[in-house]
Structure formats: C-alpha cells, structure tokens
C-alpha cells in the first residue's frame, strides 16, 4: 500500500464498529466510524473513503438507502453491506443496489478484513482502467 486506505464503518452497534476498527487498523487502514447512514450521507459530499462497510438495518436511513445515495454520488465506490438478517431477500437487495459484497453477521473478523482488502483492490483496478483525457491512448 502506498498510502493508508480509508474505510468508513457504518453501524448503529458500537461493538461491531469497535471490532472492525481494531481489525482494520491492525492492517494499516485508517477507519472512520458512523452510527447512522444519515451522518455518512452528509459527509459524502465533502469526502470519499476507499471502501464503505455498512449495516443494512439502522435507525433512520437504512444501509440500502445509503447504498442508493453512494451509487448516485460515487458509482465506483465499493460498498460492503452487512446484516444480522442473513436472509436471501437482503442479499438480493444488496446486490441489486450495487453492493460490492454482502457480509452476514456474525462474521469472521479475518474474513471481513479480507473482504475490505478485495474491495479496495477492485476499486484500484477499476481506476487503473480509466485514463485521464490528457493521457488517452492514440493509435500508432
């Protein structure tokens, strides 16, 4: 990693946020935690993390509401949706909304960290495919 990856963690459960913060920070990532999707939506206009990991069910705006807002503002930003309700409907709704991946709770911390790394790697690969207009390839 040339720079510290920034991961936003969105969950109304403080213990989940704490566990993810510690695990991701141990891997050298910078974390910012939010207890609601509403607070993230307000901040997205000013900042953008590398990856967002969000609970699906929270008071106020849901993780799916947040996902819709992110797709509008930052369509390539990878979002991992997690929920204690590991039902098929939640998984399907997450993928249909454009989630990078779905993480059912309870989750293995190492699996969650690995998933965040994969999401960040995917985002970097996607950015690498896009060349700025002043660097567009010209046929030889």
Where are these regions (language model features)?
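Active-site residues of response regulator receiver
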Residues: 55, 83
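Acidic catalytic/metal-coordinating carboxylates
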Residues: 35-36, 62-65
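Short hydrophobic/Thr-rich beta-strand motif most characteristic of the beta2 strand and flanking loop
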Residues: 28-35, 40-43
